[in-house]
Curated annotation (Swiss-Prot):
It comes from Oryza sativa subsp. japonica (Rice). The keyword Lipoprotein does not apply. It is found in: Secreted. This is Expansin-like B1. Keywords: Glycoprotein, Secreted, Signal. Residues 164-249 form the Expansin-like CBD domain.
Length: 256
């Protein structure tokens, strides 16, 4: 019996490793990825999420466009682990990217920044080889975004016009949940209005309430029976808010 076990031990170990890898990869989706051909290797400032220059440098430039994961702007700011599958060039962990744009190319789910594309590689030389390939096979899964020592920030866009039109984006959202609704509340009279996502990551209010404002966010639990959670900032947006300004919410999504 012992001799038989020793004879088949390599096969048994190989089977265990195969099953372990299959289990580990169960949460990954198989796809393809390309990259932005821009010269500065970071993301684009003209992404569909409307992040502007912030979107090019967010997450140290490890960003991506994705038509399938953009989801009419709901997917803006979501994080994904993306790893290429060529064993000669690719690292096992790949890279964590943030969705900042919508786009697809040559049957891909991701158009990565060059910075992110090369970070999937084992080495600098391997990264150069990946760029030469242009399009590579990948696996990906959604993961939690992490922004240590940062609160959620509200960026008032330059398209805003005080006091008649308020338009803003939500930056530095941790976790892996979607913001599915936003309320704009006047903090003195406690009157609130439900806002619409106008495009990309942009929320807007025509004739917003006067006075100090609280921007409250509803996070999806992902559960079929609800369990969605409101996050209420501890800081307010001042009564005399300004187009182009950023305001710290004082709160952050707590990672599990």
């Amino acid at each position: 019996m012992a001799q038989l076990l020793r004879r088949h031990l390599p096969v048994i170990l190989s089977l265990i490793l195969f099953l372990s890898k299959a289990t580990a990869d169960a949460n990954f989706t198989v796809s393809r990825a390309a990259y932005y051909p821009n010269s500065d290797i970071k993301g684009t400032e003209n992404g569909a999420c409307e992040y502007g220059a912030f979107g090019a440098t967010l997450n140290n430039g490890d960003v991506s466009a994705s038509a399938s994961l953009y989801r009419d702007g709901v997917g803006c700011g979501a994080c994904y682990q993306v790893r290429c599958t060529n064993p000669y060039y690719c690292s096992p962990n790949g890279v964590t990217i943030v969705i900042t744009d919508s786009g697809a190319s040559d049957g891909t789910d991701f158009i990565l920044s060059q910075h992110a594309f090369t970070r999937m590689a084992q080495s600098t030389d391997a990264g150069t080889a990946l760029l030469t390939l242009g399009v590579v096979g990948i696996e990906y899964r959604r993961v939690s975004c992490t922004y240590p020592n940062k609160n959620i920030v509200f960026k008032i866009t330059e398209s805003s016009n005080f006091p008649n039109y308020l338009e803003f984006e939500i930056w530095y959202q941790q976790g892996n949940q979607d913001i599915i609704a936003v309320q704009l509340c006047e903090t003195v009279n406690l009157t609130c209005q439900l806002l619409s996502r106008t495009h990309g990551a942009v929320w807007a209010a025509v004739s917003p309430p006067s006075g100090p404002l609280s921007i409250r966010m509803l996070f999806s639990s992902g559960a079929p029976r609800g369990g969605d959670t409101w996050l209420v900032p501890t800081n307010i947006v001042p009564q005399n808010w300004t187009a182009g300004a950023t305001y710290d919410s004082g709160v952050q999504v707590q990672l599990q």
